[in-house]
Amino acid sequence: MAAGGNGAGGDTRAAFARIYKTLKEELLTDPAFEFTEESRQWIDRMVDYNVLGGKCNRGLSVVDSYKLLKGADALGEEETFLACTLGWCIEWLQAFFLVLDDIMDDSHTRRGQPCWFRVPQVGLIAANDGIILRNHISRILRRHFKGKPYYADLLDLFNEVEFKTASGQLLDLITTHEGEKDLTKYNITVHGRIVQYKTAYYSFYLPVACALLLSGENLDNYGDVENILVEMGTYFQVQDDYLDCYGDPEFIGKIGTDIEDYKCSWLVVQALERADESQKRILFENYGKKDPACVAKVKNLYKELDLEAVFQEYENESYKKLIADIEAQPSIAVQKVLKSFLHKIYKRQK
Amino acid sequence: MATAEVVVANGSGGADTKTAFKEIYSKLKQEMLEDPAFEFTDESLQWIDRMLDYNVLGGKCNRGLSVVDSYKILKGVDVLSKEETFLACTLGWCIEWLQAYFLVLDDIMDNSQTRRGQPCWFRVPQVGLIAVNDGIILRNHISRILQRHFKGKPYYVDIIDLFNEVEFKTASGQMLDLITTHEGEKDLTKYNLTVHRRIVQYKTAYYSFYLPVACALLLAGENLENFVDVKNILVEMGTYFQVQDDYLDCFGDPEFIGKIGTDIEDYKCSWLVVQALERAAENQKSILFENYGKSDPACVAKVKDLYKELKLEEVFHEYERESYNKLIADIEAQPSKAVQTVLKSFLHKIYKRDK
């Protein structure tokens, strides 16, 4: 029963939620800034609105990975706190990216509510709020990890992953801009690069890297693990692209608009590779338009090219390659971490 | 002659420091464009190249150059070695990069039109709100530069913590400015000296005044926790600097200050309007309530006439003299002569400036 108290699945979530409250309270009383009542209320609301509301899979996976690396079912109180805190830093990082992405994409809703910049009184103040969210990570890390031998490594890790993600976002923005003029600019290399940098590093590599640092490891010795996780993250994003078009809106929680938004989606890239001239013309004439008739023509073409079957084959091959790469890793604990990630996403429907 | 050549080659005098500073920008930019942490496409390289030149260059670089000047004074030398020059200039550029990041985002949030005589970056065709991500890239470049050139130095973590803390204070000050302006648009009496001071302290003073000297102190091997008095003096100086800015926005010569001030139109929590609110009689307050924050030139003129009526130019000059006297007294109470020299150097660059 003691084991249960310290971190079985349900209890991990409860601890995770409690630690959010601790961290937020610390940020709202940060001695580095003299808060006014208005500014404290603003940040309180802003943080709840943007950091909460997701599934917290990235954050929780730091705790899960750390347990697997330690070969323990239960973590000590301090260990739980540190792992959850790093997990929340990743959730804060994602919140920062999403707030700014929504502004740049001119989006309307996020997780079933208006995007933060759409909220009355907020508008483009949201850009500074995104910056505040990013700065909260540095404040949290300094408060709880300064003095740890891996503190500088944590700072470098978060900074490097942020740099890769922002660079991937830049690539996405200017590629879409270029693609709107010439759809043939969309290809598998460009798509691979965008998803690798924009999503895979912070969603897959970062949680495991945090767990490795907590375990006292040197990340320079884990280049293979980084590569596997980036590959897994790429596969995850291809699934996202597929589900945007083929997923059940009831399940995925939104109506996909990649076609309307002129996205460099894996589906359109595959279509361009397989289409003959007349089919390509259908893409050139209908991709990136809001008109439901145009969207339907693109979807019909995807069916004609049998892209669902292409995706199934891609998924099967990706899974096999990932499993082979994982099982080539010398550490059994690391293998377990990587398989745990893979099995959470394999053949998911949302 | 060898000595003279070394002196010239290594950066004596203002002009040579500026030359070295400029050369180091080119080197740092090249490193950013070749960063192994990202696979650049030609399009993304061209974009970042242009974005950097547009936003990081173009200012006077006073903040950046003051790292070098301060470091020389702290070391008590006229000449720095090549390595010392490089490290000091690099930290100076990190501050310029930091300011560029803030200004790109501030211009978006303020819906501004021009910056340093050219359209704001987000106004440039093809850019628009991609500028938000460009701001983030600018911030990330600082971390990349620091990791590349300072990792392995005993003060590496201290530099990162310093930049992170100053960034946090600046973003928090910006937030305070944004929500205060929002509140003030509904109720001008929300503007007061305490709020104004807090905004300018956090939004400007830490990164413009404290950060350059703190960088020089770290380069000199100092522990910043032993220099809290220095921090307080520099924050006070930065506050005075911003009050000057507020004054010059309204009373400065546009030819000199390089822009036409719009604090009145923009409903800014300016030191001038705060002083006016403190001194105005009820009917004068009504003039402020009815005319402040409007673009109509007639309304602006009424506010300016009221500022004259309340003799705010004289109030400012008295404030300036008192600030100077207090700052000099605080500086001369510092135990280190080198630190005194650094602080006086900063103060004399800004005292009674007219742009």
UniProtKB/Swiss-Prot annotation, chain A:
Residue ranges that the Swiss-Prot or TrEMBL entry lists as coiled coil: none
GO BP terms: cholesterol biosynthetic process; farnesyl diphosphate biosynthetic process; geranyl diphosphate biosynthetic process
One GO cellular component term noted in the UniProt record for this chain: cytoplasm
Alphabetical list of SUPFAM superfamilies matching this protein: Terpenoid synthases
Metabolic or biological pathway: Isoprenoid biosynthesis; farnesyl diphosphate biosynthesis; farnesyl diphosphate from geranyl diphosphate and isopentenyl diphosphate: step 1/1; Isoprenoid biosynthesis; geranyl diphosphate biosynthesis; geranyl diphosphate from dimethylallyl diphosphate and isopentenyl diphosphate: step 1/1
Keywords: Cholesterol biosynthesis, Cholesterol metabolism, Cytoplasm, Isoprene biosynthesis, Lipid biosynthesis, Lipid metabolism, Magnesium, Metal-binding, Steroid biosynthesis, Steroid metabolism, Sterol biosynthesis, Sterol metabolism, Transferase
Single Gene Ontology MF annotation: metal ion binding
Pfam families linked: polyprenyl_synt
Main localization of the protein described in the UniProt heading: cytoplasm
Cofactor detail note: Binds 2 Mg(2+) ions per subunit.
Essential cofactor(s): Mg(2+)
Catalytic reactions of this protein: isopentenyl diphosphate + dimethylallyl diphosphate = (2E)-geranyl diphosphate + diphosphate; isopentenyl diphosphate + (2E)-geranyl diphosphate = (2E,6E)-farnesyl diphosphate + diphosphate
Residues at which isopentenyl diphosphate binds: 55, 58, 94, 111
Entry's localization field: Cytoplasm
Residues that hold Mg(2+) 1 according to the record: 101, 105
EC numbers on record: 2.5.1.10, 2.5.1.1
Residues engaged in binding Mg(2+) 2: 101, 105
Annotated positions binding dimethylallyl diphosphate: 110, 198-199, 237, 254, 263
The UniProt record lists the keyword Calcium: no
Family, similarity comment: Belongs to the FPP/GGPP synthase family.
Functional note: Catalyzes the sequential condensation of isopentenyl pyrophosphate with the allylic pyrophosphates, dimethylallyl pyrophosphate, and then with the resultant geranylpyrophosphate to the ultimate product farnesyl pyrophosphate.
Protein name (database record): Farnesyl pyrophosphate synthase
Organism (species): Zea mays (Maize)
Native organism taxonomy: Eukaryota, Viridiplantae, Streptophyta, Embryophyta, Tracheophyta
